[in-house]
Regions:
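Conserved pre-ATP/AMP-binding loop-to-beta segment of ANL
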Residues: 22-23, 33-36, 40-64, 71, ...
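Gly/Ser/Thr-rich phosphate-binding loop
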Residues: 124, 150-154, 164-228
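Conserved ATP/PPi-binding loop(s) of AMP-dependent carboxylate-activating enzymes
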Residues: 236-237, 250-287, 325, 420
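Flexible lysine-rich "adenylation lid" loop at the C-terminal edge of ANL adenylation domains
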Residues: 249, 396-421
Length: 443
């Protein structure tokens, strides 16, 4: 919630190819650097509209994956490839129309910013907020939505979960133009679907969506013409041949969990990986597990409603007794407790098997005593299964996360199992790992 002056930092980081840096809502007397104001540009009618033509797949974005599963991938995306995919998602799936107002709670380092920019091609206006979403009050973003009458309000699932936990009621705000809320970053649980319709807006299209930096877009997405089922993503994105495979590469039955795959090429596949002349990196990233099939790395289930439920990253799944358990199944139960602010769950190698270790970051003044531990275990046992119940529940001061706000189960798992963690520069709070390095878990 601390305000900071970024102008000097921008000047320091400016690349030689930058001709001008644009600022707005800033007192020009505070800086000696050569800037041009946004107002000056908007008031200038002398526009040079001569643009150089490039091939459809000419590189436009270099994006780095979040680093939750290892070193970040340096992914190059093509201009036309990304744009046609994103416009399809916005116009056909999210019902974006000319003169709409689109907002996404994202930093410029997350691919949702690139997705938001495509709104301009849909003749919509776009709005950005980069900062703490509860600055001063928990209504910060909702008030922003009201003030500008957004038609699409895009946020992370964790943001909705936190509003629900704080019992925030948005019904007093004027959100008359809001027609779509999209949620991404992690699975949106059933209870948060219910919360949105009860406490934010009852006649809104709530779309849980999932894709990634790898495709600079969405794979499973919302559909304004279909029914919404709490906890489910409505459908695959149009033109993307989504399926769920078992470990042997066979399609799973309805309601069986497996690996998210794409069986045919699609427009927004990466043009290449940077510094990958042999294409070994890109092939290893997506095509090694199943021959000629894109393996996305999500643990997922197709439902009888035609939708999908994502249970977490495939390589973060828990395997006690050899049975795969998605991490989101446990998070849904644990984070319903007011005493728990956030949690992270991993599998620890133990006596030729794997046991589940749950770490919890407590809410202010909450205490992890035997009573709370037993309540957590009981809820997990009743709503999931005895296999889901953690062997240990441990309080931790902070949850390690990437700069795009994704928790890093794999890094914590490696530390607990005595393995080296290489990619700490991808973390927003690398010092949080020190607690886990010093931890000794007894029997």
């Amino acid at each position: 919630g601390i305000r900071d002056d970024l102008v000097t930092g921008v000047q320091t980081c400016a690349l030689p190819i930058f001709k001008k840096i644009i600022i707005f809502n800033y007192d020009s007397e505070k800086t000696e650097h050569p800037y041009i104001s946004l107002e000056t540009i908007l008031n200038n009618n002398e526009m040079d509209e001569t643009f150089e033509e490039f091939p459809f797949d000419h590189p436009i974005y270099i994006l780095y994956s979040s680093g939750t599963t290892g070193y970040p991938k340096c992914i190059v995306h093509g201009a036309g490839n990304a744009l046609i995919e994103q416009m399809k998602e916005l116009i056909l799936h999210c019902d974006v129309k000319e003169n709409d107002k689109l907002f996404y709670f994202t930093s410029t380092g997350w691919m949702m910013w690139n997705w938001l920019i495509a709104g301009l091609a849909c003749k919509a206006s776009i709005y950005l907020y980069d900062g703490f979403p509860f600055y001063k009050n928990n209504d910060c973003l909702i008030k922003y939505c009201e003030d500008h009458q957004f038609t699409l309000f895009g946020v992370a699932a964790k943001y909705i979960d936190q509003l629900k936990k704080e019992k925030f009621d948005a019904k007093k705000y004027n959100l008359k133009n809001l027609k779509t809320i999209t949620s991404t970053g992690s699975p949106l649980v059933k209870e948060s679907f219910v919360y949105v319709y009860e406490k934010i807006k009852k006649d809104v299209h709530l779309g849980s969506i999932s894709g990634g930096t790898d495709v600079v877009g969405v794979i499973n997405i919302c559909n304004p013409f279909n029914s919404i089922y709490a906890g489910e993503i409505q459908c695959p994105s149009l033109g993307i041949d989504v399926d769920v495979f078992d470990e042997n590469g066979n399609s799973t039955k309805i309601d069986e969990k497996g690996e998210l795959v794409i069986k045919k090429p699609f427009p927004s596949m990466p043009v290449m990986f940077w510094n990958d002349k042999t294409e070994d990196k890109i092939l290893n990233a997506y095509f090694r597990k199943f021959k000629n099939i894109w393996h996305h790395g999500d643990y997922i289930q197709k439902t009888k409603n035609g939708g999908y439920i994502i249970y977490g990253r495939s390589d973060a799944t828990l395997k006690p007794g050899g049975v795969r358990i998605g991490t989101s199944e446990i998070y849904r139960q644990v984070e319903s407790f007011d005493e728990i602010q956030e949690s992270i769950v991993i599998g620890q190698n133990y006596k030729n098997d794997v046991r589940i270790i749950l770490f919890v970051k407590l809410s202010y003044q909450a205490k992890l005593d035997d009573e709370l531990i037993n309540k957590i275990k009981k809820k997990i046992r009743i709503n999931c299964s005895p296999r889901h119940v953690p062997s240990k529940i441990i309080s931790c001061p902070d949850i390690p996360r990437t700069k795009s706000n994704k928790i890093v189960e794999i890094s914590v798992r490696k530390i607990i199992n005595g393995e080296k963690v290489d990619n700490i520069e991808a973390l927003a709070n690398p010092n949080s790992l020190e607690f886990f390095r010093q931890l000794k878990i007894d029997d």
